[in-house]
Amino acid sequence: MKTFNQFGQPVGEALSNWQPRQHPSRVVLQGRYCRLEPLRVEHANALFSAYSLAEDTRSWTWLLREPDATAEEFAEWVANVSELSDPIHFTVIDNQTRSPVGTLSLMRIDPKNGVVEVGHVHFSPLLSRTPMSTEAQYLLMRYVFDTLGYRRYEWKCNSLNEPSRKAALRLGFQFEGRFRQALVIKGHNRDTDWFSILDKEWSALALSLIHISEPTRHAQI
């Protein structure tokens, strides 16, 4: 809603009751098909094996880092990032097999303004294009909006990454625009596409996603 100041200038909607939100925690988020656990070194070998099921390394093309040549290299990366407070990496655990099948994270965390981005999404062939993949995204969204009370949830990707762009739209993100020449990644220019979901959009969106997930619970660890 547009409001006006004493000079008759349009200013943003007044948020007189707004308070900074809590920083996301290392929580477990339980769903029907999968659960999210904070990334731990104990997940590394199973994750490396799951990623190795891919026929090639094309799933790494859009990531910020190159593929790890060995399980030891991957485990070292996990050890380096698993205790970070931003980004907070989560492992997706298949409820049937109880095995790690992918990762995603909360990043660029801004509690003061209630803004956070989902990123570092890397799903193995065991997770991609399954009900688990949508549920994993839903569980993280629900935590951000319903538990933490954030106002804005972001998704950013390389403008050439068509699968990521389609996934964002399928999950209910709204395209906001393109930041040209935003980054240099692996020696190549990257134009970055921005997407978002707002808190006022979440209730309706959750209804469209809820059929794939039973009520969730989370427990801090």
Task: Give the location of each predicted region.
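A conserved beta-strand-loop-helix scaffold within acyl/acetyltransferase catalytic domains
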Residues: E55, S59-G114, V121
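Single conserved hydrophobic/aromatic residue that forms the stacking wall/gate
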Residues: I210-I221
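Conserved N-terminal entry element of GNAT/NAT acetyltransferase domains
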Residues: K2-V41, N45, E55-W60, S213
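Conserved catalytic-core motifs of GNAT/GCN5-like acyltransferases
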Residues: Q174-H188
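A conserved beta-turn-beta hairpin within the catalytic core of GNAT-like acetyltransferases
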Residues: I109-G119, S128, G149-R151
